[in-house]
Amino acid sequence: MSQQASTELTIEEGELPTRFEIELEFVQSLANIPYVTYLLTQLQLWQDPKFKRYLKYLEYWHEPEYAQCIVYPNSLFVLKLLNTLFEGSTVNENGVLEGCEHVPRILQTQGTQWMNEMVERWRE
């Protein structure tokens, strides 16, 4: 490896986002209902138990010390909504979530309404 490549690699490593930054960005992306719908439908994440656990883990963003970093507070509403919708789902023998098949459909049918309501709350 050349000296220049080594220097570039070091610089890139120093610019990697922290776990905090990654999780903050992801939580805030939940305010974008079309993006959440994409994750659930196109990537089939609604069937993945790891995704359910990750959303549950992210609940700590509701704590005041973390919530103060949130620019899009509606993302916390969507996080809570998703965790509520996934509640009661179980993992079958194939390692796939069952009991949450309705989640993508709910977001597709009501997501636009929720986004409009979020915008209205911002205006108040």
From Swiss-Prot:
Coiled coil: none
One GO cellular component term: mediator complex
GO MF term set: transcription coregulator activity
InterPro entries: Med31_sf (IPR038089), Mediator_Med31 (IPR008831)
Gene3D superfamilies: Mediator of RNA polymerase II, submodule Med31 (Soh1)
Keywords assigned by UniProt, alphabetized: Activator, Nucleus, Transcription, Transcription regulation
Any one Gene Ontology BP term: regulation of DNA-templated transcription
Keyword Transcription regulation found: yes
Presence of keyword Amino-acid biosynthesis: no
Subcellular location: Nucleus
Protein family: Belongs to the Mediator complex subunit 31 family.
Functional description taken from the UniProt entry: Component of the Mediator complex, a coactivator involved in the regulated transcription of nearly all RNA polymerase II-dependent genes. Mediator functions as a bridge to convey information from gene-specific regulatory proteins to the basal RNA polymerase II transcription machinery. Mediator is recruited to promoters by direct interactions with regulatory proteins and serves as a scaffold for the assembly of a functional preinitiation complex with RNA polymerase II and the general transcription factors.
Summary of subunit composition and partner proteins: Component of the Mediator complex.
Record-given protein name: Mediator of RNA polymerase II transcription subunit 31
Organism: Kluyveromyces lactis (strain ATCC 8585 / CBS 2359 / DSM 70799 / NBRC 1267 / NRRL Y-1140 / WM37) (Yeast)
